[in-house]
Amino acid sequence: MNMKTLLALAVSAVCSVGVAQAHEHNTIPKGASIEVKVQQLDPVNGNKDVGTVTITESNYGLVFTPDLQGLSEGLHGFHIHENPSCEPKEKEGKLTAGLGAGGHWDPKGAKQHGYPWQDDAHLGDLPALTVLHDGTATNPVLAPRLKHLDDVRGHSIMIHTGGDNHSDHPAPLGGGGPRMACGVIK
């Protein structure tokens, strides 16, 4: 082998390693995931299956990918709640859907609702869930402060009837209103 051939091979090898490293750096490897069964809440007639939300680890945080149907069109508050329960409970003498889930998950004691990337807000605050006119939701949302599946195991996913302004004003907890659908994260 002559010197020119050796030099060409060496340059080619170095370039190949550089391209491989650049490609590896720009991809998002799919990590571990959990599939959560979601039900529309009805404390009187019983809950009804509406699909799943798959939670996946990524380099940028947890990704929540819904595969839901039969929901009302529009933006809906979407949160991680404290307890692994979607059961109804009584509040002020009235059976309330999903109350067994507790409040928004707030392990750091922020005591305020906010944006999913806001450090001084509930850790369970997620981007709003978009439901299309046909009642389906398939658009993933990213929770950048949540990094590992173990962060959310033993809690629940909650979808509220109304949207979410990511503030406690003018209405508390983003104004999402009643609990519409729920799933326990196992």
Curated annotation (Swiss-Prot):
Q: Which Pfam families match?
A: Sod_Cu
Catalytic reaction equation(s): 2 superoxide + 2 H(+) = H2O2 + O2
Q: Name a GO CC annotation attached to this entry.
A: periplasmic space
Q: What is its EC number?
A: 1.15.1.1
| Main subcellular location | periplasm
Q: Which Gene3D superfamilies match?
A: Superoxide dismutase, copper/zinc binding domain
Cofactor(s) needed, names only, are: Cu cation; Zn(2+)
Instruction: Kindly report, in one word, the top-level EC class recorded for this enzyme.
Output: oxidoreductase
Keywords, in A-Z order: Antioxidant, Copper, Disulfide bond, Metal-binding, Oxidoreductase, Periplasm, Signal, Zinc
Q: Which GO terms describe its biological process?
A: removal of superoxide radicals
UniProt: Zn(2+) binding residues: H104, H113, H122, D125
What biological function has been recorded for the protein in this entry?
Destroys radicals which are normally produced within the cells and which are toxic to biological systems.
Q: Which PANTHER family match?
A: SUPEROXIDE DISMUTASE CU-ZN -RELATED (PTHR10003)
Family statement? Belongs to the Cu-Zn superoxide dismutase family.
Subunit details: Homodimer.
Protein name, entry field? Superoxide dismutase [Cu-Zn]
Gene encoding this polypeptide?
sodC
